[in-house]
């Protein structure tokens, strides 16, 4: 049928529990880093527990914020873009639409991606995104 766009939250089953095999899903874009509400009492309690266990400055490896919020957020984002390519013969576009995935800085999440993914992803400026996607589909011999 005609091309379609699905917009959903990263907290729903469409980004984790549905298998889009074959050409059912050609691309996925995660806009932002899906960190949950940091002000909720539960979130603050979990963060505090991790801070007490590992040290607020990450002495034990990671801070409470990283362990309670950042790591699960990056895991959710990776799970969502993983919906695109489910087998060795599938191709698709996977995009993280947030500079924090690409650059090294105090608020970067790049270090939470596996090394192979860090190498695979290519930062693209917004004005070149359309061109980059067209070039990708041309290179794999598919018109999407």
Q: What are the roles of these predicted feature ranges?
A:
Residues 1-144:
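ASCE RecA-like P-loop NTPase motor cores
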């Amino acid at each position: 049928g005609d091309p379609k766009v699905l917009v959903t939250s990263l907290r729903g089953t469409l980004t984790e529990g549905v298998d889009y095999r074959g050409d059912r899903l050609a691309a996925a874009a995660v806009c932002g880093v899906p960190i949950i509400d940091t002000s909720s009492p539960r979130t603050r309690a979990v963060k505090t527990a991790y801070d007490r266990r590992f040290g607020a400055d990450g002495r034990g490896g990671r801070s409470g914020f990283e362990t309670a919020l950042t790591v699960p957020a990056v895991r959710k984002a990776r799970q969502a873009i993983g919906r695109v390519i489910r087998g060795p013969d599938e191709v698709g576009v996977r995009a993280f639409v947030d500079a924090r995935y690409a650059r090294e800085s105090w608020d970067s999440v790049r270090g939470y991606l596996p090394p192979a993914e860090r190498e695979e992803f290519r930062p693209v400026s917004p004005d070149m995104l359309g061109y980059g996607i067209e070039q990708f589909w041309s290179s794999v011999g598919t018109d999407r």
